[in-house]
Amino acid sequence: MSLVNTSWLEENLDKVKIIDCSWHMPQTERNGFNEYKNKHIKNAIFFDLDKNSKKDTDLPHMLTDAKSWENIVSNMGIKNDDQIVIYDNSDVISSCRCWYNFIYFGHNPELVHVLDGGLKKWIEEDRATTSDIIKIIPSSYTV
């Protein structure tokens, strides 16, 4: 797994696709999407781990099929050659699950990174956050 540090991401904010994949255990009564809407790294897109997983199973967060993955990623505006940085704001390291999905479906591993320390470290270092939601222009991602 390729980690990037907060300094690197801050210098490259406009050169990479940033994904917030925060997910919390139900008993925490926290909601990753609501937290994303209130505070996230500039240009981040939210990845809903529940909605973007296989639906016809009792097991949580199983990989979806390739066609569904293409639709999910295309609707996030991500292209096959995009460099991606994934982070979370949770105690369950949900960013790693999102990373695994991209690797499993063939995104170049050299282009998929996880932010070391996640949003927690970003905030601790007093780096800028926003509540602005970016306008996504869909792409044509293929597996």
Feature annotation, model-predicted:
Residues 1-33, 120-143:
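Flexible, polar/low-complexity N-terminal or interdomain linker segments that lie immediately upstream
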Residues 13, 41, 107-109:
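Short, well-ordered coil/turn elements that cap or connect secondary structure elements
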Residues 60-143:
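Thiolate-centered catalytic microenvironments shared by cysteine-dependent enzyme domains
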Residues 38-41, 45-76:
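Aromatic- and Gly/Pro-rich amphipathic surface segment
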Residues 26-29, 53-56, 92-96:
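Short active-site-adjacent helix-start/loop capping segments
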Residues 22, 50, 90:
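Anionic group-transfer/hydrolysis microenvironments
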Residues 35-38, 104:
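A general structural signal for stabilizing positions within well-ordered secondary structure
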Residues 18, 44-46, 112-114:
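Conserved beta-strand scaffold positions in the cores of enzyme catalytic domains, especially
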